[in-house]
Design a protein with these regions (language model features):
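Short, solvent-exposed polar/charged micro-motifs at secondary-structure junctions
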Residues: 24, 64-65, 90-94
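Short non-domain terminal segments
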Residues: 10, 27, 49-52, 90
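A short, charged, amphipathic alpha-helix used as a generic interaction element across diverse proteins
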Residues: 35-78
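Short intrinsically disordered terminal tails
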Residues: 1-4, 87-94
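Short N-terminal "domain-start" leader segments
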Residues: 1-45
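Intrinsic disorder/low-complexity segments
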Residues: 15, 19, 31, 46, ...
Length: 94
């Protein structure tokens, strides 16, 4: 039986908004629709980069829960560095 690999990936970025609020957000680039793609990309580009990568498509729902937990921690003021983010997401990264 051949080994099956997941070739579909979800590209994402965690960033901090450039606006006064400075909230941490995520954008899933490969899931954007045509009507909101340009706006979302511009907002992410104006923000401060925190972490980016590719999620395995088949694991994306579980990965998004982890990303949401990371965002909650960041927005509460916790110091969550790139190494910690990568460790939390490691099982879901492509």
């Amino acid at each position: 039986m051949p080994l099956m690999t997941d070739t579909k990936k979800v590209m994402f970025e965690i960033y901090r908004e450039a606006s006064y609020s400075g909230r941490y957000k995520v954008v899933y680039f490969t899931e954007l629709g045509e009507h909101d793609k340009e706006t979302e990309i511009q907002e992410a580009m104006r923000g401060e980069h925190v972490f980016d990568g590719f999620l395995l498509h088949r694991e994306r729902n579980q990965a998004k829960q982890i990303v949401d937990e990371i965002l909650e921690r960041l927005n509460r003021g916790e110091d969550v560095d790139q190494t910690t983010i990568e460790q939390n997401l490691q099982p879901y990264l492509a």
